[in-house]
């Protein structure tokens, strides 16, 4: 990326962020926390795309990150709408207590 920070450091940071997101997704039971962990994983992938695109002096990685961010924004809007609907009907955000097959 730059002359002072090698590509490997960016990739290690991206891997660390992705692993934190996966661990949070697996351990946490709150729907909003799980949603934030998914967004953290998306941002880790975006960091990897930007790091490789800058290292290879390519614009395609930056453009792909832009599209991923647009899709993530749409996903956030739809996901939060679903979370609000689930909370209104079940009055909880705990994944273990939310069973949409029961009335």
Swiss-Prot record:
It is a multi-pass membrane protein. It catalyses: a quinone + NADH + 5 H(+)(in) = a quinol + NAD(+) + 4 H(+)(out). GO terms for biological process: ATP synthesis coupled electron transport. The chain crosses the membrane at residues 7-27, 31-51, 63-83. GO terms for cellular component: NADH dehydrogenase complex; plasma membrane. Keywords: Cell inner membrane, Cell membrane, Membrane, NAD, Quinone, Translocase, Transmembrane, Transmembrane helix, Transport, Ubiquinone. Its EC number is 7.1.1.-. GO terms for molecular function: NADH:ubiquinone reductase (non-electrogenic) activity; quinone binding. The keyword Ubl conjugation does not apply. It is found in: Cell inner membrane. NDH-1 is composed of 14 different subunits. Subunits NuoA, H, J, K, L, M, N constitute the membrane sector of the complex. HAMAP family: NDH1_NuoK. NDH-1 shuttles electrons from NADH, via FMN and iron-sulfur (Fe-S) centers, to quinones in the respiratory chain. The immediate electron acceptor for the enzyme in this species is believed to be ubiquinone. Couples the redox reaction to proton translocation (for every two electrons transferred, four hydrogen ions are translocated across the cytoplasmic membrane), and thus conserves the redox energy in a proton gradient. This is NADH-quinone oxidoreductase subunit K 2. It comes from Koribacter versatilis (strain Ellin345). The gene is nuoK2.
């Amino acid at each position: 990326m730059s002359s002072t920070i090698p590509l490997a450091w960016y990739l290690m940071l991206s891997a660390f962020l992705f692993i934190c997101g996966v661990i949070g997704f697996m351990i946490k039971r709150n729907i909003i926390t799980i949603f934030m962990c998914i967004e953290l994983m998306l941002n880790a992938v975006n960091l990897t795309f930007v790091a490789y695109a800058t290292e290879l002096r390519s614009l395609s990685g930056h453009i792909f990150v832009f599209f991923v961010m647009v899709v993530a924004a749409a996903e956030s809007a739809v996901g939060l709408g679903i979370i609000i609907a689930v909370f209104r009907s079940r009055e909880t955000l705990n994944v273990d207590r939310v069973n949409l097959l029961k009335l």
